[in-house]
Amino acid sequence: MFVTSAFAEETAPAVTGGDTHSGTGVPAEAHGTFPPFDPATFPSQLLWLAITFGLFYLFLKKVAMPRIGGIIDVRNDRISQDLDQASKLKGEADAAVAAYEQELAEAKKNASSIGQQAADAAKAEAETARKKIEAALDEKLGEAEARISSIKANAMKEVGSIAEDTASAIVEALVGGKASKAEIAAAVKSVAR
């Protein structure tokens, strides 16, 4: 702390009684021990110690411990209720999971059955359509074969007349004379067989 000269004293205060203090020491009247360690006060200290601990014990026994015991009992009851409820909820959850898994298995089974039925229906439908198409194709094939045989028969009739005309033209060109139609027809028939 900064002290200005206005606050500072020029001279020390005078000592009353003419004594000056020149040493440090214990005053003559202050001899003895610290009171709690004085053996003369031990009996009263022990009495108050016993009274204090007795009152403290009664306070703990009558007030603090019943409250603490009640709190512990309430907490134990709450914990047991929570455990019971958790066990109940776990059972319900397990039952729900089992029901879900059973429904899932049934759904898979039903889906498999439905898929098989759809595949069988599609196969039967395809078989029916194939049979219809085969019948239509067989009918068209029969018609085509009939037309082909008709065309072939007509062509064979015409081939005979074409062969007769061609043979007649060849005989005329080679021999220079005409052959009769009966002779040419007989020659064509003999070659065709």
Curated annotation (Swiss-Prot):
**Gene Ontology terms for molecular function:** proton-transporting ATP synthase activity, rotational mechanism; proton-transporting ATPase activity, rotational mechanism
Q: Does the keyword Membrane apply?
A: yes
What is this entry's stated membrane topology?
Single-pass membrane protein
Q: Answer yes or no on keyword Cell membrane.
A: yes
| Transmembrane regions | 40-60
The protein's matches in CDD domains, at most eight in alphabetical order, are given as: ATP-synt_Fo_b
Subunit description: F-type ATPases have 2 components, F(1) - the catalytic core - and F(0) - the membrane proton channel. F(1) has five subunits: alpha(3), beta(3), gamma(1), delta(1), epsilon(1). F(0) has three main subunits: a(1), b(2) and c(10-14). The alpha and beta chains form an alternating ring which encloses part of the gamma chain. F(1) is attached to F(0) by a central stalk formed by the gamma and epsilon chains, while a peripheral stalk is formed by the delta and b chains.
Q: What is this protein called?
A: ATP synthase subunit b 1
Q: Which organism is it from?
A: Mesorhizobium japonicum (strain LMG 29417 / CECT 9101 / MAFF 303099)
